[in-house]
Amino acid sequence: MTKRLSTVQAVRLCLFLALSIPLFSSNGTGTETAGTGKTQQSFPVETLRIVVAGDLLLDRGVRQRIGQVGIDGLFSPSVDTLFLSSDYVIANLECPVTAIRERVYKRFIFRGEPEWLPALYRHGITHLNLANNHSIDQGRNGLLDTQEQIRKAGMVPLGASRNMEEAARPVLISARPRPVWVVTSLRLPLENFPYLPQKPSVSQESADSLVMRVARLRRADRHCVILVLLHWGWEHHLRALPGQRE
């Protein structure tokens, strides 16, 4: 883990979680279970490899680093090997990436350049999660434009949309041979950004609402895989808070 973190340098991909999910196809064959006389259905197994990365910041010191080595220089061969060998790579984009400048009045304000996004796609990133406390740094218009810029670069934005209902909607990232859904939510307060559920926003679903949403997905398809990505916790702390454990 230490080596991986150092290779990404200032990009701040804080965590790599590689998930190998066994997915079963629907074409099974009957086999007898030893000693029982019963026939069980067996399925060929396919594996889906999903990498979930942490914060990806494209401002401050990272902006300076890009000016020195270019955005491709932020990715080491070992990171490329991990990302490009995976089916999907989901990263938390910790800044709006837009030419729009409508700064929200808050302590830390970030912004990345849209022309950097295609490089993220080239290096294997497929989905960018916007359900965090910095996606709104350039206002609601900057948030919507960030979504559009992500799509133009060939990736899929998660956790933000034209209103809260759309922002919180689960996203199907893989349908076959077994559905994989991603549910995202920001569980931190937004600084000087009013909660207006009918306006462009990031997903801020409550814990109770998240539980019900996951339960509905599970009832609809008990074989699906559900990934819940939460932006929460206390910065610079390595242990979960009591509320997170609950």
Predicted regions and their residues:
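Bacterial N-terminal signal peptides that target proteins for export
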Residues: 2-14
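Bacterial N-terminal signal peptides
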Residues: 12-22
